[in-house]
Amino acid sequence: MVVHIENLNAFSAALKNAGDKLVVVDFTATWCGPCQKIGPIFETLSKSEDYQNVVFLKVDVDDAADVSSHCDIKCMPTFHFYKNGQKIDEFSGANEQTLKQKINDHK
């Protein structure tokens, strides 16, 4: 399941509540073509048995501008990876293989 984050308070709470689970954040925009391509893949990964202990968050950079500003997002899609509230990795682009590899590396 993907949790849609509306603001910075919700983002901070989601990171805190995740504890030591891997958190994957998809920074996206409705007008971004590559974002629309990778979005359904992100959704499918979130429902996978392999990733039951991974928290999937989605941040629309227009709806939650405070979060995208706080995280210094420059392009979409950008994926951030967190553990214990700390960012441990990131990459930009709609690359399914890279997304899966990084989730598997960090989970």
Curated annotation (Swiss-Prot):
PTM text: May be nitrosylated on several cysteine residues, depending on the oxidation state. Nitrosylated Cys-75 may serve as donor for nitrosylation of target proteins.
InterPro entries, alphabetized: Thioredoxin, Thioredoxin-like_sf, Thioredoxin_CS, Thioredoxin_domain
Family the UniProt entry places it in: Belongs to the thioredoxin family.
Functional summary from the UniProt entry: Participates in various redox reactions through the reversible oxidation of its active center dithiol to a disulfide and catalyzes dithiol-disulfide exchange reactions. Plays a role in the reversible S-nitrosylation of cysteine residues in target proteins, and thereby contributes to the response to intracellular nitric oxide. Nitrosylates the active site Cys of CASP3 in response to nitric oxide (NO), and thereby inhibits caspase-3 activity.
Name the UniProt record assigns to this protein: Thioredoxin
Compartment annotation: Nucleus; Cytoplasm; Secreted
Site, Deprotonates C-terminal active site Cys: residue positions: D26
Disulphide bridges, residue numbers: C32-C35
Species per Swiss-Prot/TrEMBL record: Ictalurus punctatus (Channel catfish)
Main location: nucleus
GO terms for MF: protein-disulfide reductase activity
Active site residues according to the UniProt entry: C32 (nucleophile), C35 (nucleophile)
